[in-house]
């Protein structure tokens, strides 16, 4: 004859307190890691922006060497196949926010250089417009 409830197997698992401790540890780790992750994203945006500006300035210079004048618009660089498409400013997330710098007197064309139209300061401490 069996005794009721005497042979109930011991249940195995985690207690509520153990689960809460683990969740607290995970939350603590996230609060330490999240700011570093966000800073690294900002640094990456600055790096991509600086590289986009460097490449665009080189392309404008190449256009000037080839044609003897500076381009009248960024779209002209695409139309003449110096660019496949206008690059996106990673800070403003738009290809329409570039600030165009005109050449000095005596030069033909309208774009000597360009800057970012993004406001604010990059993680390096420089203004985005000064990159």
Where on the chain are the PLM-derived regions?
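N-terminal single-pass transmembrane signal-anchor helix
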Residues: 10-34
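Hydrophobic alpha-helical segments typical of transmembrane helices
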Residues: 33-36, 73
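Aliphatic-rich helix starts adjacent to a transmembrane/signal segment
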Residues: 36-53
């Amino acid at each position: 004859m069996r005794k009721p409830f005497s042979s109930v197997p011991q249940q195995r698992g985690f207690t509520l307190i153990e689960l809460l401790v683990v969740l607290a540890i995970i939350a603590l780790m996230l609060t330490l890691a999240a700011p570093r992750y966000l800073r690294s994203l900002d640094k990456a945006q600055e790096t991509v922006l600086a590289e986009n500006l460097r490449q665009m300035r080189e392309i404008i210079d190449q256009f000037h060497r080839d044609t003897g004048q500076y381009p009248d618009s960024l779209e002209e660089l695409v139309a003449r196949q110096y660019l496949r498409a206008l690059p996106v400013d990673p800070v403003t997330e738009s290809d329409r926010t570039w600030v165009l710098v005109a050449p000095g007197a005596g030069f033909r064309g309208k774009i000597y250089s360009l800057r970012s139209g993004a406001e604010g300061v990059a993680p390096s401490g420089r203004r985005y417009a000064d990159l």
